[in-house]
């Protein structure tokens, strides 16, 4: 029996081999204990402030919205150490691993941001680190691969399947099932078997807590909408978490529309998927009529995933959050637009969320609205991808 509720409505659960159940129960127990431990909280808070660089600013776009009555604020997770929101939860998980006396960390990565974060948290806390990464993602994220290796991590190429994030996840789980006694699986998003979605949400909720305080201080009111990209969904659930009970605030998750929903070259399981079992959880997934997992597609490696975290599936089913899609082309346009107008280069993942905010602004230019976009990471890693896309 789990100590915490393992489901969000109908979604979630622990669909893993029996051999992994003791490791998941141990993780849940340590997580609950740590949340009650003032020593753990102080240690994590100290790392977030003095190592990671929290709090991150909430930046008002001064040029992007000229000529309209829209205000767009950017939550600047790109300014964290490591360059993305991943830092928040890897520090928490690394501390949990130390408390459980684990010697090794196993992780998966798509865009490489979680891999980089896992690598530096292991370097900081003296843990061995091995990271599984799809061959396709290795080829498009060479800079992050080198960063991981530079910090002492072993990067293991995954050549099976489509050579992307889902295949890296499968290999990481396989490794963990063989080595769970000495190793902790540092899952990179708010997905997978319980208790991972709950743990990752807890450690990412700092984004939403800060954002709410900051926007009330700046505007003396709540925003009209909070917008975030959704792959597995950790940055989105992190910023959504503080606003879920505020029904006046629209929560908008942006999935990768890839080359267009009509082409099947996309990664939008919430709006164009079915309920199924994948990666240890019951959630919305992209699958064929025969139940086989479809290959997802996105210009953004971090969104190239055929499933989504179970809490997003629940928010979608209850209609508390709205989920939309943005194509590769629209995301690249937003990437260029923010870079040129504000001097901020966003990750391609975050550019999906920004693109939808720009749609809302352009559709209602004279509407007084306050939009918050979570800039989940910086775009240095994506320069070559965008350059090749534009053939510059």
Swiss-Prot record:
Pathway the protein contributes to: Amino-acid biosynthesis; L-tryptophan biosynthesis; L-tryptophan from chorismate: step 5/5
Similarity field: Belongs to the TrpB family.
Modification N6-(pyridoxal phosphate)lysine occurs at: 86
Annotated GO CC locations: cytoplasm
Catalytic activity: (1S,2R)-1-C-(indol-3-yl)glycerol 3-phosphate + L-serine = D-glyceraldehyde 3-phosphate + L-tryptophan + H2O
SUBUNIT field: Tetramer of two alpha and two beta chains.
Name of the protein in its database record: Tryptophan synthase beta chain
Organism: Buchnera aphidicola subsp. Melaphis rhois
